[in-house]
Amino acid sequence: EFHLRDHTADIAVESLALTLEEAFSGIAEGLSQAHSPNSLSGTKKFHLNISSESLESLLFDFLDMLIYERDVYNVLPTNHKVSITQKGDIWNLEGTYYGVPLDTIESREIKAVTYSDMEVKKTPNGWRLYVVFDV
């Protein structure tokens, strides 16, 4: 016998910023805080270069890459800096972050970024980004 039960296993992050780059960096910092609420600083610098056909897919690919690199390099990405440009129909993100070794911190696992309720919106005060992660 079994029963299906509703279960929420998500965490959402909102970033409000004057610039698109600050909003992307804010969402990435939110991802770091969702992993570990402690204030952390990494020592090893990592570089990212991501291209996509929309801002939503660029945001998804950026966060997905941070989760992937967390798993591959066993570091929690922190202190994110990004530059975003558009050339024709293609958006490009170049960025850096510092990695905190996972074996030195207590953290919960964020499994994946989702498109569920994702929002990338220009506002009168700058930018609003909203992302839901599976935990």
Residue ranges of each PLM-predicted region?
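N-terminal intrinsically disordered, cationic/polar leader segments
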Residues: 1-135
